Regions:
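Short C-terminal tail/terminal secondary-structure segment
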Residues: 2-14, 235, 246-259
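Conserved glycine-rich cofactor-binding loop
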Residues: 24-25
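Substrate-binding pocket helix/loop in short-chain dehydrogenase/reductase
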Residues: 107-108, 112-120, 215
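Active-site helix of classical SDR
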Residues: 131, 170, 178
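Alpha-helical segment proximal to the catalytic Tyr-Lys
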Residues: 136, 183-184, 243
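Residue(s) in the substrate-gating loop at a strand-loop-helix junction
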Residues: 152
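Short, small/polar-rich loop/turn modules that mediate ligand/substrate recognition or access, typified
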Residues: 186-191, 245-247
Length: 259
């Protein structure tokens, strides 16, 4: 899928443990590979065991360190258990990438309680719980850390033509969560920032395109972005270069949306 080298922009993350959610496809898979290529010890998490193991094997074949751990982002017990398992295998998590998310793909008045709960739990409650668990450990050990939340440009703009009402709502909340956690944990040297992607190639995007058709021709550059084009921003936010950057939201959308 990618025409870009791995990683697109490099930095040294040797010795740091990076916990990435939603790594079985799309952006999360790319994030895990990029962080490992830069020396981080990666905890790759998700629901699909076969894909997690395949990703870990791929990273190890390239000389990286990766431990696959199954996680259910709708279950607080699963989240906490996965973090404990990650610590037992690799040590304290210093980098957290809250990437896991699901779409609603349904009009608000037609959404079932089950879908509503799943979207809220996966997109907001799960990242909240995981962020707090990681931060608590870092604070107890007086260690600095980096948390990067993945929101969406849907947090800022929504089209009535596409059923994304609840998805947009949860991603808006992720933006505010980023800002709030950044303020609360600044004194502890835990930087919390957010990336708000536009249309990038992923399973979620493929699903949307199958429902609404090709949207790229309405974009100024008439393209869907490649996950590799997010490398430099991700690495900036987890590296010493962003030491003074916290509570910031960076839109990466190729000029696709309004301002």
């Amino acid at each position: 899928m990618s025409e870009f080298p791995l990683p697109n922009v490099s930095t040294d993350l040797s010795g740091q443990v990076a916990f990435v959610t939603g790594t079985t496809s799309g952006l999360g898979k790319r994030f895990a590979k990029v962080l490992a290529a830069c020396g981080a010890k990666v905890v790759a998490t998700g629901r699909r065991v076969d894909r997690l193991e395949a990703l870990a094997e791929e990273i190890r074949a390239d000389g990286g360190i990766c431990e696959p751990i199954v996680i259910d982002m709708t279950s607080r017990d699963s989240i906490r258990a996965a973090l404990v398992e990650a610590e037992s295998r690799l040590g304290t998590v210093q980098i957290l990438i809250n990437n896991a998310g699901i779409p609603d793909a349904e009009r608000a008045i037609k959404m079932s309680d089950e879908l509503t709960d799943a979207v809220f739990d996966t997109n907001l409650i799960g990242p909240w719980v995981l962020s707090c668990e990681v931060a608590r450990r870092l604070i107890e050990q007086k260690m600095p850390g980096r948390i990067v939340n993945i929101a969406s440009v849907a947090a800022f703009n929504i089209s009535g033509a596409i059923a994304t009402t609840l998805y947009s709502t949860t991603k808006s909340a992720v933006v505010r969560m980023t800002e709030s956690h950044a303020v609360e944990w600044a004194r502890n040297h835990i930087n919390v920032n957010c990336i708000a992607p536009g249309a990038f190639s992923s399973e979620m995007m493929d699903g949307m395109l199958s429902r609404v058709g090709d949207i790229s021709q309405g974009f100024p550059r008439r393209r869907i972005c490649d996950p590799a084009q997010m490398d430099s921003t991700l690495l900036f936010l987890v590296s010493p270069a962003s030491e003074c950057v916290t509570g910031t939201v960076i839109k990466i959308d190729d000029g696709q949306g309004p301002r």
